[in-house]
């Protein structure tokens, strides 16, 4: 029975790596005339390789591809960390948010980092070293981009990396890495809170300061005033610490304060209702990078 189970598992991984049998979908969007427009796309779940010691780790990822052959510019969306065991966290899809990029001609990939969902390895975290945590998470973004570079429909010269909550910290840590084709990064309510560390807020500010000194790309930061994780004035402190150290393209960083959003502005990206709040400024950021952001019909 064990040999049969291993065989079935191997076959499943081969299928995932080959990206066979994609799931087709469609979404209702509004065109310029206010009418519903139907958009087709493909959703695929893959297990992508990450080099690790002593052996390779496979990361679960969701890939959304617009209809057509491409090549399509790429958006990477990095997930946050839900309470509880990371291995029990569900696969991130952010379907409503992903569709906004799909309908503008972007492929979207959402990797589950090491130890999350069906990704292999153990979750890297738990210590009070927030800066190191972010850098270790950023390795998974590199592995994701390396995998997407093998897909013929992806334009690897036009990449934007986005992250929410813990994924925002991951994204800003990744911004210290010079990866060809990455043009900018967006941080939605990014950070990491460890209440077992009495000085976690100072460590978080220091982590962003360190990232700022090494960052390589323009960035847009999106935070609110009633964030259950990052109370005011912490978002401003994190941003200012980053910007004070940033040079070159990274000095082109901007903080968008969305004010109060519902009961918790930490959800401004993950909640469907938040899309109209941030989408116009995200569009402006894309255009500032020389990227298109007009919705197709």
Please name every model-derived segment.
Residues 31-69:
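N-terminal cap/lid segment of alpha/beta-hydrolase-fold proteins
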Residues 71-80:
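Short beta-strand element of the alpha/beta-hydrolase
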Residues 82-94, 100, 110-136:
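Cap/lid segment of the alpha/beta-hydrolase catalytic domain
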Residues 129-152:
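Alpha/beta-hydrolase active-site loop
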Residues 154-164:
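Alpha/beta-hydrolase fold nucleophile elbow
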Residues 168-179:
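Short glycine-enriched nucleophile-adjacent loop
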Residues 184, 190-247:
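The feature captures the conserved acid-bearing segment of alpha/beta-hydrolase catalytic domains
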Residues 247-297:
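C-terminal catalytic histidine-bearing segment of alpha/beta-hydrolase fold enzymes
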């Amino acid at each position: 029975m064990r040999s049969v189970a291993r065989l079935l598992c191997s076959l499943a991984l081969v299928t995932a790596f080959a990206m066979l049998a994609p799931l087709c979908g469609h979404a209702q969007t509004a065109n310029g005339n206010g009418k519903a427009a139907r958009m087709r796309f493909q959703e695929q779940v893959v297990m992508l390789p990450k080099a690790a010691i002593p052996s390779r780790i496979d990361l679960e990822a969701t890939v959304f591809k617009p209809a057509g052959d491409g090549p399509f510019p790429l958006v990477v969306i990095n997930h946050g960390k839900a309470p509880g065991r990371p291995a029990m966290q569900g696969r991130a899809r952010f379907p409503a948010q992903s569709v906004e990029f799909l309908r503008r001609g972007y492929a979207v990939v959402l990797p589950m980092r090491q130890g999350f969902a069906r990704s292999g390895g153990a979750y890297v975290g738990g210590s009070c070293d927030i800066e190191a945590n972010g850098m270790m998470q950023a390795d998974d973004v590199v592995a994701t981009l390396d995998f997407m570079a093998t897909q013929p429909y992806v334009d690897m010269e036009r990449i934007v990396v986005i992250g929410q909550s813990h994924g925002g910290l991951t994204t800003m840590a990744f911004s210290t890495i010079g990866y060809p084709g990455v043009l900018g990064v967006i941080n939605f309510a990014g950070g990491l809170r460890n209440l077992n560390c009495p000085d976690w807020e100072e460590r978080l500010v220091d982590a962003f300061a360190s990232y700022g000194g090494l960052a390589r790309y323009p960035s847009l930061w999106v935070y609110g005033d009633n964030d259950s994780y990052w109370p005011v004035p912490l978002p401003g402190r994190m941003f200012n610490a980053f910007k004070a150290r940033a040079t070159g393209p990274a000095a082109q960083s901007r903080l968008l304060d969305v004010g109060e959003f519902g009961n918790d502005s930490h959800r401004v990206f993950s909640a469907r209702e938040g899309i109209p709040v941030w989408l116009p400024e995200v569009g402006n950021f894309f255009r500032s990078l020389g990227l298109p952001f007009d919705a197709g019909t």
